Regions:
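A short beta-strand motif characteristic of beta-propeller blades
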Residues: 2-7
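Repeated scaffold domains used in trafficking and secretory/extracellular systems
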Residues: 8-18
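Acidic/hydrophobic-patterned starts of short beta strands in beta-sheet-rich repeat architectures
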Residues: 18-34
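Acidic, small-residue rich beta-repeat scaffolds with periodic aromatic anchors
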Residues: 29-144
């Protein structure tokens, strides 16, 4: 199985049909962000989308929007629930850091940098948001 051969970290890889590429893409976790889960009780990673073409595997993030949208809808719901139950504080932000990073990077992967910025402003409630954003983008830019 192709999806099992791509290192996916804590995310179980899965295949899904994408209208954006009119075919199957394989969704895996982006293991570069695993360290953000060290203080979490629920683990999550941003995702990468891969396309299999003519015997080769290609990163298809720039071509796939719908998968990132679906992933982020789940993240948005989870964050809203956490902030509703635990309060909109920096302390809550620290507990859901991996969710925030995943949503932000998923928006970047889908080409929605402006939406990513708005997302970060809404959900990252600590004073060091620029530092956090810079650290995420440094990791993100190492592959892309």
């Amino acid at each position: 199985y192709l999806a099992d051969s791509i290192y996916s970290g804590i995310i179980k890889p899965y295949g899904v049909f994408s209208e954006d590429v009119n075919g199957i893409v394989y969704v895996t976790g982006d293991t570069r962000f695993e360290s953000l889960n060290q203080d979490s009780t629920i683990f999550i990673l941003p995702v990468n989308c891969w396309k299999f073409v003519d015997g080769e595997v290609f990163l298809a993030n720039a071509s796939v929007y719908d998968v990132f949208s679906d992933e982020n809808n789940l993240i948005l719901q989870a964050l809203d629930d956490y902030y509703l139950s635990d309060g909109r504080t920096c302390s809550t932000t620290r507990r859901v850091l991996a969710f925030i990073a995943s949503g932000f990077i998923n928006y970047y992967n889908s080409g929605e940098q402006t939406v990513a910025e708005k997302f970060l402003k809404k959900y990252y409630l600590c004073n060091n948001s620029e530092e956090f954003k810079s650290s995420l983008l440094k990791i993100f830019n190492n592959q892309n």
